[in-house]
């Protein structure tokens, strides 16, 4: 039961990093968009 709770929420020591952790899953999407913008800038060669 304690393990499930820890997975669901960060421990108290990492509480200041909670906003950063909320943003982390978006980073791969940003890389995908970056690749698209890069290809658009080189005219999809």
From Swiss-Prot:
The chain crosses the membrane at residues 20-40. One of its GO terms (cellular component) is photosystem II reaction center. It holds the Pfam family PsbK. InterPro entries: PSII_PsbK, PSII_PsbK_sf. The keyword Thylakoid applies. It comes from the Eukaryota. One of its GO terms (biological process) is photosynthesis. Residues 1-8 form a propeptide. Keywords: Chloroplast, Membrane, Photosynthesis, Photosystem II, Plastid, Reaction center, Thylakoid, Transmembrane, Transmembrane helix. It is found in: Plastid, Chloroplast thylakoid membrane. SUPFAM superfamilies: Photosystem II reaction center protein K, PsbK (SSF161037). Belongs to the PsbK family. PSII is composed of 1 copy each of membrane proteins PsbA, PsbB, PsbC, PsbD, PsbE, PsbF, PsbH, PsbI, PsbJ, PsbK, PsbL, PsbM, PsbT, PsbX, PsbY, PsbZ, Psb30/Ycf12, at least 3 peripheral proteins of the oxygen-evolving complex and a large number of cofactors. It forms dimeric complexes. One of the components of the core complex of photosystem II (PSII). PSII is a light-driven water:plastoquinone oxidoreductase that uses light energy to abstract electrons from H(2)O, generating O(2) and a proton gradient subsequently used for ATP formation. It consists of a core antenna complex that captures photons, and an electron transfer chain that converts photonic excitation into a charge separation. NCBIfam families: PRK02553.1. This is Photosystem II reaction center protein K.
